[in-house]
């Protein structure tokens, strides 16, 4: 398997058949095919687009599903507009709701079938039931999402990154770059890189020091630096991260 999410599909009793092209997808379809599944973030980088998968599904009368767990649940939903039957989102990523919750949007008949497989019904998903507290918390998160000023939120994310950058901008050899992921975890991400010999710490050492401090600060690290994603930071977190990063980078 490639990653643990493959098992989330296999656990319902199906066999995964991986394809790369439209021809391979159509050739793999038979009377036992239960679902066509695609990872939304990677769809446009592959040879089968979301719209093409949806078209094939309708042609062969097979349900289609997009895993968009880390994406923004935008309205109107472009996956549903592309023709897929259902799309799933995490309740705990962009929505900032309970980590153990999620949303499935789409065809009412399919959603009803999913509902019948979970609590309060005694079916396959009974062990993974969401509590009533999680359901209401996710509903609140969705209501907050549609009311949120996303443009102002983005500016706040940029400000948080700037606070961190300003705190270490004078460290020898340090450089900064930013990028925005295409679909999943969409927010401005800042890469902070440096020459380990000049600073005296490798990226792995800096990441470990941040993680082992108080409070713990978790970052991604790569060969020459670390990365900061502000969209999971709470108000004031930047004022904790910035001095801690400076302390580590300037202490030998």
Residues covered by each model-derived region:
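Conserved PLP-dependent catalytic core of the aminotransferase class-I/II
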Residues: 146-180
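Conserved PLP-enzyme active-site core in the AAT-like
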Residues: 1-147, 165-169, 230, 244-247
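Conserved C-terminal alpha-helix-loop-beta "cap" of PLP-dependent enzymes
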Residues: 167-247
